[in-house]
Amino acid sequence: MYTQGAFVIVLNESQQILLVKRKDVPLWDLPGGRVDPGESAEEAAVREILEETGYNAALSAKIGVYQRPKFQDEQHLFFGSITGGQAMADGTETAGLKWVSPGRLPLFMVPNRKRQINDFKNGAQDVNVTVKDSGLLAAIDLLKRRLGK
């Protein structure tokens, strides 16, 4: 079964990217998550930002779709902006929020996010990319899926 995720790059006035610290694994990530049945990737992206950060958001562009055939997974990446709401640093899925310069991303990030952020910085729009996960990353992802996280 193919899974789909939707993630969003949100910039503030200082051109910093909003990151969330995940509770399931101690890594920084873009706001986002799984697309629910009957939901579009765009709807999922907006919903996930609200659930993970407390912010309402609007999407302005699709950066691309990142295919991970080894795991039958595809991730939709969007660019968006905050339209309201209030920061929620500690939620059910999120252990923290922070704004970071695109040139100073944290060391511990979800695999492939830095590449996606670099694609955005380089002007990517509506690209379709096939990602090859390393053996270690593949093993971690497989273990996570089997544990239901």
Curated annotation (Swiss-Prot):
Molecular function per GO: 8-oxo-7,8-dihydrodeoxyguanosine triphosphate pyrophosphatase activity; metal ion binding
Record's protein name: Putative 8-oxo-dGTP diphosphatase
Protein species of origin: Bacillus subtilis (strain 168)
Entries under SUPFAM superfamilies matching the protein: Nudix (SSF55811)
InterPro entries, alphabetized: Nudix_hydrolase, NUDIX_hydrolase-like_dom_sf, NUDIX_hydrolase_CS, NUDIX_hydrolase_dom
Catalytic activity of the protein: 8-oxo-dGTP + H2O = 8-oxo-dGMP + diphosphate + H(+)
Function according to Swiss-Prot or TrEMBL: May be involved in the GO system responsible for removing an oxidatively damaged form of guanine (7,8-dihydro-8-oxoguanine, 8-oxo-dGTP) from DNA and the nucleotide pool. 8-oxo-dGTP is inserted opposite dA and dC residues of template DNA with almost equal efficiency thus leading to A.T to G.C transversions. MutT specifically degrades 8-oxo-dGTP to the monophosphate. Functions, in conjunction with ytkD, to protect vegetatively growing cells from DNA-damaging agents such as H(2)O(2) or t-BHP (t-butylhydroperoxide). The 2 proteins do not however protect spores.
Primary enzyme class: hydrolase
Pfam families: NUDIX
Disruption phenotype: Growing cells lacking this gene have an unchanged spontaneous mutation frequency, even in triple mutT/yjhB/yvcI disruptions, however they are more sensitive to DNA-damaging agents such as H(2)O(2) or t-BHP. A double ytkD/mutT disruption has a greater mutation frequency than the ytkD disruption, as well as an increased sensitivity to DNA-damaging agents. These properties are also seen in stationary phase cells.
Membership in a protein family: Belongs to the Nudix hydrolase family.
Annotated PANTHER family: 8-OXO-DGTP DIPHOSPHATASE-RELATED, GDP-MANNOSE MANNOSYL HYDROLASE
Top-level taxon: Bacteria
Keyword list, A-Z: DNA damage, DNA repair, DNA replication, Hydrolase, Magnesium, Manganese, Metal-binding, Mutator protein
Lineage: Bacteria, Bacillati, Bacillota, Bacilli, Bacillales
Motif Nudix box: chain residues: 33-54
